[in-house]
Swiss-Prot record:
This is Protein Nef. Changing residue 15 to A: In strain: Clone pNL4-3. It is found in: Host cell membrane; Virion; Secreted; Host Golgi apparatus membrane. One of its GO terms (cellular component) is virion component. A motif (PxxP) lies at residues 72-75. It comes from Human immunodeficiency virus type 1 group M subtype B (isolate BRU/LAI) (HIV-1). Gene3D superfamilies: HIV 1 nef anchor domain (4.10.890.10), Nef Regulatory Factor (3.30.62.10).
Amino acid sequence: MGGKWSKSSVVGWPTVRERMRRAEPAADGVGAASRDLEKHGAITSSNTAATNAACAWLEAQEEEEVGFPVTPQVPLRPMTYKAAVDLSHFLKEKGGLEGLIHSQRRQDILDLWIYHTQGYFPDWQNYTPGPGVRYPLTFGWCYKLVPVEPDKVEEANKGENTSLLHPVSLHGMDDPEREVLEWRFDSRLAFHHVARELHPEYFKNC
């Protein structure tokens, strides 16, 4: 008895059911919108551009010319522990992030690229406050931000070919502590959630 919905062989349902069964939890340290995605499979009305900084930032990117479509080409999902570890190792293997001077603009470009190609909502790449080493809040992300030695900053700014807009020339203007930071890979961060130990207050709602 029953119509088309009584059959488990409805086109694609077994695949969807299996995907739901295997859905990984969001990694510790992701933002509120990613928690929504984990819990409800979508971003709810409690996280809008008016109430959530990551949602507002993403909406603003849609109005800017960023070089690639902002709408993801894959389903929207929260960053998971496994995905953060895999992404860290992928970027280490491909090169380009290790030792790169951090700026908010560069982080935005990385977040948008990952959002566009992988569908991970861009509220996962957050770090502990400074001064000193900034550890990732998202467990599994193996890149920390490390202050660059002042003499290396000075050395990088010598000569006439220095770009005044290069992040190293901005002398930490992006950073509340005025430190020049660089991304540094640390495989131990896949096993040791340093941010949670240093700042348990950030994880009360996790």
